[in-house]
Amino acid sequence: MQDELFETEKAPQKNTKNAKNAPKKSFEEHVHSLEQAIDRLNDPNLSLKDGMDLYKTAMQELVLAQKLLENAYLEYEKLQTLDKKA
């Protein structure tokens, strides 16, 4: 359960019918995907269409990474509250 707070569902494969069975992606994996996207976006030979598609994908990765970071912070705050009560 605890690990689920820090993972998001990876994009399902084309043949995957059930998103619940999709593997989870960690915060670090999202950040790595963002780093790769930034590297590719810096390619002067990247077409406008490919650049826009990559940008949209990168923004989705960013949102998911931010959600994981927020979940981690909320869990941290919860633990701090429990420590103060003890």
Curated annotation (Swiss-Prot):
Pfam family, one: Exonuc_VII_S
Protein name stated in the entry: Exodeoxyribonuclease 7 small subunit
Principal subcellular localization: cytoplasm
InterPro entries per UniProt: Exonuc_VII_S (IPR003761), Exonuc_VII_ssu_sf (IPR037004)
GO molecular function: exodeoxyribonuclease VII activity
Enzyme Commission code(s) on record: 3.1.11.6
One GO CC term, this protein: exodeoxyribonuclease VII complex
Keyword Nuclease: yes
Family annotation (HAMAP family): Exonuc_7_S
Region (Disordered): 1-26
GO biological process assignments: DNA catabolic process
Residues in the signal sequence: none
ATP-binding in keyword set: no
Function: Bidirectionally degrades single-stranded DNA into large acid-insoluble oligonucleotides, which are then degraded further into small acid-soluble oligonucleotides.
